[in-house]
Amino acid sequence: PARHLSVLCNQMVNFLGIMQNEWAGAQAFSSFDTYLAPFVKVDNLSYPEVKKCIEAFIYGVNTPSRWGTQAPFSNITLDWTVPDDLAELPALVGGVEMDFKYKDCKKEMDMVNKAFIETMIEGDSNGRGFQYPIPTYSITKDFDWSDTENNRLLFEMTAKYGTPYFSNYINSDMQPSDVRSM
């Protein structure tokens, strides 16, 4: 298993590229920000280092890789806040339980989200938006609606591209953890 964010991002790109040749339809990673945050924490990565890794992931999944020169149809879900069912679990990095929990990685989650959204807003070298991955953000009772930097970026991306999708867990019978069982 990957022990560093840069390696993990490369492995995810390769996985999506391979799987899109094996299965029809979108391939997805759930709780993207929650699961990547411990890698940021363990290596004490700076924001520019995190952004470089996330950029590599986004550019990688937008690289045509199969007959018909199509990029892998890919989705990611982002939790924005640590889900209750993961909060108290020991974080995993490189297949090893860390001495901290997922709930201890909120700062790193925010870095992953900021890097992802900024890269999506910036677009490619010609300023065009990225087709993939299609992001879905979980809106829960814990969503902080205040005027934060990440909220401004999230809604700027929404206004600019009409993406992401939002999963409304406030007025739903579903739980945020259900996304990992779909």
What are these regions (language model features)?
Residues P1-M182:
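Conserved catalytic cores of very large enzyme subunits
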